[in-house]
Amino acid sequence: MALGFLEKEYESQVLPYDDEETPVKLCEKKMLPIVTFDDGYSSNESLDIIARADEENRLGTKSLLADKEKLEQMDQLLGEIGSPVHNLAMPYWIWTPEFNESSRRYFVDKKSKKRGPFHLLAQKKQQFLDELPPVLTKVQGLLTGPYYNGETLGIEDIMIASHLWGLYVIPEFQFPNDLHRYLQSIGNLCKFNYHEDFWRQEI
């Protein structure tokens, strides 16, 4: 999203989720996404990547990184969003194009250690759906205008949108109208196309 907003050209390479060798080779850690810059520097820390790409600080990433209290508040908010979202969406995500049988099994085995068996997550779907309204209401209350910081899109909006967007795969879930408009506005400004990478070529 951030690279689209900043109009940065980049080449995307989708790695199988069970590819541990490539991330460790580039960044000494299995974590995605990874960006390798023109000077050869590679990073898998999203805010570091965006701050480096955003030389003019248009998204305010450097300002957020410099404000420890605000950064902690954002981390807490994203944790509150992530818990029900991931529990709901992971059983759906494993059937999206980036997963083959091997990487799907790897993902399920790894995530089940933290969240429990995926078939039980699917059975608890209504419980997780019921956990969403208070979290979404909190997000709505934090928007001081069309966006988190008022009239201008900032890094906080991209962080929030990247966590919420996965809910669009849940058939039984529908965003409140104002949050849907908020997310779609971010998507438009960032030229974001979900799963664009997987449909560049005919199969």
Where does each model-flagged region fall?
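Acidic carboxylate-rich catalytic motifs and surrounding loops in phosphoryl-/glycosyl-chemistry enzymes
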Residues: 14-16, 153, 199
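Short, hydrophobic secondary-structure boundary micro-motifs
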Residues: 61-65, 148-151, 176, 195-198
